[in-house]
Amino acid sequence: MSTQSTASVSTHILDTSIGRPADGVTISLAARTGADAQWVALGGSATDPDGRCKDLPALPEGTTHVRLDFETEQYFTKKQAEAQQDAPRVRDSGAFFPEVAITFAVVPGEHFHVPLLLNPFGYSVYRGS
Protein backbone atom coordinates (compact mmCIF):
# COMPACT_ATOMS: atom_id res chain seq x y z
CA MET A 1 0.00 0.00 0.00
CA SER A 2 1.35 3.40 -1.00
CA THR A 3 1.75 6.19 1.52
CA GLN A 4 1.52 8.90 -1.14
CA SER A 5 -1.66 10.92 -1.07
CA THR A 6 -3.30 11.80 -4.34
CA ALA A 7 -3.53 15.26 -5.83
CA SER A 8 -6.86 17.10 -5.84
CA VAL A 9 -8.36 19.63 -8.24
CA SER A 10 -10.87 22.47 -7.99
CA THR A 11 -11.87 25.26 -10.35
CA HIS A 12 -14.10 28.26 -10.77
CA ILE A 13 -15.06 30.46 -13.71
CA LEU A 14 -15.39 34.22 -13.87
CA ASP A 15 -17.02 35.80 -16.92
CA THR A 16 -14.83 38.85 -17.42
CA SER A 17 -17.22 40.35 -20.00
CA ILE A 18 -19.78 40.99 -17.26
CA GLY A 19 -17.61 40.86 -14.15
CA ARG A 20 -19.61 37.99 -12.66
CA PRO A 21 -19.23 34.27 -11.94
CA ALA A 22 -20.24 31.92 -14.76
CA ASP A 23 -23.12 29.78 -13.46
CA GLY A 24 -24.13 26.45 -15.02
CA VAL A 25 -21.03 25.62 -17.07
CA THR A 26 -20.56 21.87 -17.39
CA ILE A 27 -17.04 20.69 -16.57
CA SER A 28 -15.58 17.26 -17.31
CA LEU A 29 -12.49 15.87 -15.60
CA ALA A 30 -10.06 13.35 -17.09
CA ALA A 31 -6.71 12.05 -15.84
CA ARG A 32 -3.77 9.98 -17.01
CA THR A 33 -0.83 8.32 -15.30
CA GLY A 34 1.94 9.43 -17.65
CA ALA A 35 2.57 11.48 -20.77
CA ASP A 36 1.99 8.45 -23.02
CA ALA A 37 -0.95 6.99 -21.07
CA GLN A 38 -4.56 7.11 -22.26
CA TRP A 39 -6.93 9.66 -20.79
CA VAL A 40 -9.50 8.22 -18.37
CA ALA A 41 -12.76 10.13 -17.92
CA LEU A 42 -13.47 10.56 -14.21
CA GLY A 43 -16.77 12.41 -14.38
CA GLY A 44 -17.75 15.99 -14.00
CA SER A 45 -20.03 18.59 -12.56
CA ALA A 46 -21.28 22.11 -13.25
CA THR A 47 -20.51 25.51 -11.79
CA ASP A 48 -22.80 26.92 -9.12
CA PRO A 49 -24.08 30.54 -8.93
CA ASP A 50 -20.67 31.56 -7.52
CA GLY A 51 -18.95 30.05 -10.59
CA ARG A 52 -17.43 27.30 -8.44
CA CYS A 53 -17.33 23.60 -9.16
CA LYS A 54 -17.10 22.04 -5.71
CA ASP A 55 -17.70 18.37 -6.41
CA LEU A 56 -15.22 17.22 -9.03
CA PRO A 57 -14.27 13.55 -8.61
CA ALA A 58 -11.13 12.57 -6.73
CA LEU A 59 -8.00 11.86 -8.77
CA PRO A 60 -6.78 8.26 -8.85
CA GLU A 61 -3.45 7.40 -7.27
CA GLY A 62 -0.62 7.77 -9.77
CA THR A 63 -2.24 10.65 -11.70
CA THR A 64 0.39 12.80 -13.43
CA HIS A 65 -1.76 14.89 -15.79
CA VAL A 66 -5.26 16.30 -15.57
CA ARG A 67 -7.57 17.71 -18.23
CA LEU A 68 -10.52 19.97 -17.47
CA ASP A 69 -13.01 20.42 -20.31
CA PHE A 70 -15.27 23.45 -19.90
CA GLU A 71 -18.39 23.29 -22.12
CA THR A 72 -18.79 27.02 -22.75
CA GLU A 73 -21.06 27.11 -25.82
CA GLN A 74 -24.30 26.52 -23.92
CA TYR A 75 -23.33 29.15 -21.36
CA PHE A 76 -22.67 31.80 -24.01
CA THR A 77 -25.80 30.89 -25.96
CA LYS A 78 -27.92 31.20 -22.82
CA LYS A 79 -26.35 34.56 -21.96
CA GLN A 80 -26.49 35.74 -25.59
CA ALA A 81 -23.04 37.07 -24.79
CA GLU A 82 -21.70 37.20 -28.32
CA ALA A 83 -24.68 39.16 -29.59
CA GLN A 84 -23.75 41.88 -27.10
CA GLN A 85 -20.19 42.23 -28.41
CA ASP A 86 -19.02 44.50 -31.22
CA ALA A 87 -16.75 41.91 -32.86
CA PRO A 88 -17.87 40.79 -36.33
CA ARG A 89 -19.36 37.28 -36.36
CA VAL A 90 -20.79 34.92 -38.90
CA ARG A 91 -24.48 34.73 -38.06
CA ASP A 92 -25.55 31.52 -36.31
CA SER A 93 -22.03 30.12 -36.30
CA GLY A 94 -22.15 29.29 -32.59
CA ALA A 95 -19.77 30.32 -29.86
CA PHE A 96 -16.26 31.32 -30.90
CA PHE A 97 -14.93 29.07 -28.11
CA PRO A 98 -17.52 26.28 -27.82
CA GLU A 99 -15.28 24.54 -25.30
CA VAL A 100 -12.08 25.21 -23.41
CA ALA A 101 -9.73 22.31 -22.62
CA ILE A 102 -7.00 22.85 -20.04
CA THR A 103 -4.30 20.22 -19.46
CA PHE A 104 -1.81 20.46 -16.62
CA ALA A 105 0.63 18.35 -14.61
CA VAL A 106 0.00 17.38 -10.99
CA VAL A 107 2.09 15.89 -8.21
CA PRO A 108 0.85 13.67 -5.37
CA GLY A 109 -0.26 15.35 -2.19
CA GLU A 110 -0.88 18.81 -3.64
CA HIS A 111 -4.12 20.63 -4.33
CA PHE A 112 -4.46 22.36 -7.70
CA HIS A 113 -6.99 25.19 -8.01
CA VAL A 114 -7.26 26.18 -11.67
CA PRO A 115 -9.51 29.23 -12.26
CA LEU A 116 -10.76 30.13 -15.73
CA LEU A 117 -11.26 33.79 -16.67
CA LEU A 118 -13.61 33.72 -19.62
CA ASN A 119 -15.24 36.04 -22.13
CA PRO A 120 -16.85 35.38 -25.53
CA PHE A 121 -13.62 35.91 -27.47
CA GLY A 122 -10.84 34.96 -25.07
CA TYR A 123 -9.85 33.18 -21.92
CA SER A 124 -7.03 32.93 -19.42
CA VAL A 125 -6.20 30.26 -16.87
CA TYR A 126 -3.71 30.08 -14.03
CA ARG A 127 -2.78 28.03 -10.99
CA GLY A 128 -4.58 29.59 -8.08
CA SER A 129 -4.39 28.84 -4.39
Residue ranges and their predicted role:
Residues 1-23, 31, 123:
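Beta-strand-rich domain onsets/edges
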Residues 2, 65-129:
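Feature of secretome-associated and extracellular-like proteins
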Residues 17, 25, 43-46, 57:
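Short hydrophobic alpha-helix segments
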Residues 17-19, 28-30, 49, 53-54:
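Charged, well-structured alpha/beta interaction segments
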Residues 26-30, 67-69:
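Beta-strand signatures of extracellular beta-sandwich domains
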Residues 36-54:
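Short, acidic Ser/Thr/Gly-rich low-complexity loop/linker segments typical of extracellular
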Residues 54-64:
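Short Pro-Gly-centered beta-turn/loop motif in secreted/extracellular proteins
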